[in-house]
């Protein structure tokens, strides 16, 4: 019965996937959310692992918790979009440029999802009792886990295989199968929100880089303080980009950055070259 339902829903899921791909396609391809991508066999094994470790709550299902979470995710994305409109960071972060170009699609998807939710139906969805997704529908956790560990891909064949592997230990209810198209839409908003968190971090580091270059104490002294605190390589990238933009020449800064990057087998020169090659690929 489960296999039949999955087959029936292929058409609906196909259209959701088309929207997903449109949302996640940039000049160089889709947005990559996580580094820890699982291969095909690992992904299916992980589905079985999830199934064995998920514990369902005895409480009645409630979609309100998920809807509040969806609203919060959208507000965060919206705030990031507005902040980017007046920030130069979009020039150095491909995901930021993508968000500016595609926000209208995200907004449209969010509004349609809110309109299409049948709260009475979604109350039938089993809720997880504990863990990161405690209080959320089980099918939502399953879909988010799939996207998180599959390079954010919603390929229909992988989706079906993942769900079938999950059901090796725990059978999904019919209501969960029927809910997949809308749950996918909500999960996509979750994934985009996570990307926005990375964009926000990059914006903060861009601002910090500007502060360092404008420091009244001098660039070298300001940078030395932050180097002791162990800044990320992203801060260095922003510094180099701003120096290039302003045609600034700070050999001491380059030397200090090189010294810090040496421990990870990277140099400022390599970073500049890598950025140049990336921009060349983007424009090609």
Which stretches of residues belong to each language-model region?
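Juxtamembrane/interface segments at transmembrane-helix termini
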Residues: 20-27, 200-204
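Extended charged low-complexity segments that act as oligomerization/scaffolding linkers
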Residues: 190-198, 202-206, 214-230
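Alpha-helical transmembrane segments
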Residues: 12-22
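Extended, charge-enriched "interface" segments that sit outside catalytic cores
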Residues: 29-63, 234-284
């Amino acid at each position: 019965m489960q296999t039949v339902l999955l087959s029936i829903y292929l058409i609906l899921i196909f259209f959701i996937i088309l929207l997903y791909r449109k949302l996640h396609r940039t000049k160089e391809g889709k947005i990559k959310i996580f580094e820890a991508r699982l291969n095909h066999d690992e992904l299916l094994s992980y589905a079985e692992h999830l199934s064995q470790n998920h514990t369902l709550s005895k409480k009645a299902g409630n979609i309100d918790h998920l809807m509040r979470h969806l609203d919060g995710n959208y507000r965060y994305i919206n705030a990031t979009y507005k902040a980017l409109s007046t920030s130069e960071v979009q020039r150095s972060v491909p995901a930021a440029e993508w968000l500016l170009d595609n926000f209208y699609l995200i907004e449209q998807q969010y509004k349609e999802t809110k309109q299409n939710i049948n709260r009475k139906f979604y109350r039938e969805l089993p809720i997880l009792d504990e863990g990161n997704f405690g209080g959320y529908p089980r099918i939502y956790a399953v879909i988010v886990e799939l996207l998180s560990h599959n390079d954010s891909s919603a390929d229909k064949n992988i989706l079906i295989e993942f769900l079938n592997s999950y059901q090796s230990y725990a059978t999904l209810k019919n209501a969960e199968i029927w809910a997949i198209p809308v749950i996918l839409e909500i999960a996509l908003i979750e994934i985009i929100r996570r990307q926005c968190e990375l964009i926000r971090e990059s914006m903060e580091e861009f601002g910090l880089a500007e502060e360092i270059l404008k420091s009244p104490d001098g660039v070298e002294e300001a940078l030395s303080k932050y180097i002791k605190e162990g800044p990320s390589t992203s801060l260095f990238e922003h510094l180099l980009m701003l120096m290039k933009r302003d045609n600034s020449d700070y050999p001491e800064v380059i030397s200090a950055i090189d010294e810090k990057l040496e421990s990870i087998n990277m140099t400022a020169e390599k970073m500049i070259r890598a950025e140049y090659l990336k921009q060349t690929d983007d424009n090609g």
